[in-house]
Amino acid sequence: MLTIQEFCFNAFQENTYILYNEHKEAIIIDPGCYTRMEQKMLTDFISTQQLTPTLLLNTHCHLDHVFGNNFISTTYQLAAHFHPNEQIVLDRLPEAAAKWGVATEPYIGPVQYIQQNEIISFGKDSFKVLLTPG
């Protein structure tokens, strides 16, 4: 059985999700945790639930969805997974942040691209990647 935990992070009110199964495996989706307090909220939940994050997934790479990528990648030794069309958006993160008047560092962790119709396995469950640009 899959469970979803939602967090609302950063000044943009971005939704971050932790999807986890009965085996305590977790996927972190769009980690928008910007402050240390938000990072602690996320890691405290993961620790309290005794979860093991296995995947960092970005639905897209707008700044509010990737503020926590470096933190999650470093903390849990995970690569960021996203569609290759989002690489240019991620590369422009510092510029986009400056336009909004927020400070952030470029993402420096590993990247793994996901493709249209790719299957992501997660315990007994699997998900099909659907490209929904726009």
What does each model-found stretch correspond to?
Residues 34-123:
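Active-site HxH/HxHxD metal-binding segment of metal-dependent hydrolases
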Residues 25-27, 55, 125:
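Structural motif
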Residues 18, 117-134:
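Core dinuclear metal-dependent hydrolase active-site scaffold
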Residues 1-49:
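Conserved beta-strand hairpin/beta-sheet module of binuclear metal-dependent hydrolase folds
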Residues 28, 64, 129-130:
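Short glycine- and Lys/Arg-enriched binding-loop motifs that mark or flank ligand-binding interfaces
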